[in-house]
Amino acid sequence: MKNIVAEIQGSYGPVNLAERVLQKIWCSGDFRRDNLKTCTGEKLEIVKFGEWNKLDGPDFKNVEILIDNIKICGDVEIHFYENDWNLHQHGGNAAYRNVILHVVLFPNPSGTPKITENSRGDSMKTLVLLPYLNRDLEEYALDEALVAVEMQLEKSESGIAELLADIPERERIDVLRERARERWQQKCFFSKKRLTEAGWTQFCHQIVLETLGLKHNRAAMSHLAQRFSTTTMLGMSAENLFNAEAGNWKSFPIRPANHPKNRLAQYLKLLEKNPDWQTMLKASVAHFQKIENATKWTQIFRKQSQLKRIHDYFKEQVFAGTLTGTRFETLMVDAILPALAGTTERDLFEYWFHWNLGDAPANIQKSLKNANVLSREMPMSNGLFQGVILLELQKSRSRKK
């Protein structure tokens, strides 16, 4: 199956978006699925997303949808543009005779679909995905690229040594800080955009559930946050919530602690112990003091800023001791700190950089130590990891050119 790539204009320049990313969005249901409408105005409900076909033919087989409450079964084909159907000559290909829904990313300039029949001549509806996406297109593309980079780094301890080999040892920390700063700016940009669209309370509700769903169940958790408010969830059990997304959970390969039912139970415990956590979270920015001429050395910064005290305040007070381990650290660096920066205009980069490492490849610390990056003054931190993955991403893109 050919993986077609389109170039889109992102906030940080052109971004390559693979058609596979669109297929993953459909497969995981990582878009707003309530109040879906076809291009011709019919109400669309998705009963089954179908099986992802990675061979020739339609992208998804055995899909079930409701069009104006009428059940229809068949296949789904996904493209960037409606006219890709003609460019790929699907209209004359019998393999596409059962397509019932054409999912496209971008709308037809005229606003009206021109392709309304599959290769058998039966009616085929069109859904434009762009208005229903949960996140910025650039964020989807970047996430996909970063997952590939993390998998690459996880495979080999020598990968980081090779990555840093052409950088003099005395400059490595500075280079990683520069890349980490870029990563921070990206996170803050995407966070601020989502904040503007959703509002503080809903945004917080969604990002915490999404983080608890990493990596395989982010979309299902996001959909739960859209369907049920925190108030509604308080009257539900983890079993109720789990069943509400029945058929959309990925139960492999995850550890028992990461099972969605256990993660939902954690979130319900947070709502029970601290129902006002979103308000407390917004006010928590006062705990971050402004440090002039902050040192780059993690050990010194953590002491100067009283970072452990701040860390424990979030863990024990805001999140009421309900979230622990690397998943709590991931929540803070991937969601909470960028969100606080986005809503208060405070530059929290140094705190984010020197924060504890969250979920990451198991060999990252040993690899950085072997590359002479880590020391007593520079223990492992979130920022070093973020710098590594963005540096690897940029170098991998350069190699492909």
Please give the residue ranges for each predicted region.
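Hydrophobic, aromatic-lined core segments that form the binding pocket/scaffold
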Residues: 173-400
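A broadly used, surface-exposed interaction patch
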Residues: 59-111
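Short Lys/Arg-enriched alpha/beta "domain-start" segment
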Residues: 6-45
